[in-house]
Amino acid sequence: NKYITGLERTNLLNAIADKYNLDVFTGNEELNIEKAVMHKSIDYYSRMPEVFRKSKINLNMTLRSITSGISLRVYDILGAGGFCLTNYQEDIAKLFKDGEELVMFTDENDMLNKLEYYLLHEEERMAIALNGHKAVKKFSYDNVLEYILKYIALT
């Protein structure tokens, strides 16, 4: 449920902020990550792409209630040219290559290990971000619409 996911996210963000510089952009004024730099929500369409692109690591944590599909944030991060570190979701693994186009983690310890690794390995991190940016292009509206129209024609 949403409450449990909120607690998990807060715990993960606190664990990150205990070791690393962390900026959090949120519309949730009640969220307080003590050691993080908290930012108010900014315009998702005009300003967030720049944040995604300029951040060393962008974290995606899918709601527990989402058992299939992919958060739009994954596409947005990759589309902006950002490096995406996301919790493991089977559907993400079907569409993107872990460790080549984005990076997935399975638990808090795995996430912290991967954060440390990719902060220390900038060239590898940047190559993964570039590969992710290239990979997400196949999901443009034109390509998806073409796929849907072909699928409809076959049925």
Could you say what each language-model-derived stretch is?
Residues 111, 124, 128, 144-148:
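Hydrophobic alpha-helical packing elements
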Residues 102-108, 118-122:
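Conserved acidic donor-binding segment of nucleotide-sugar-dependent glycosyltransferases
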Residues 124-138:
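A short, well-ordered alpha-helix in the C-terminal region of glycosyltransferases
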Residues 141-155:
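C-terminal alpha-helical cap of glycosyltransferases
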Residues 1-66, 83, 89-92:
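Nucleotide-sugar donor-binding catalytic core of glycosyltransferases
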Residues 45, 49, 71, 126:
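Glycine-rich phosphate-binding loop at the start of an alpha helix
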Residues 49, 72-79, 93:
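Short alpha-helical segment that forms part of, or immediately flanks, the ligand-binding pocket
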Residues 98-99:
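Glycine-centered loop/turn motifs
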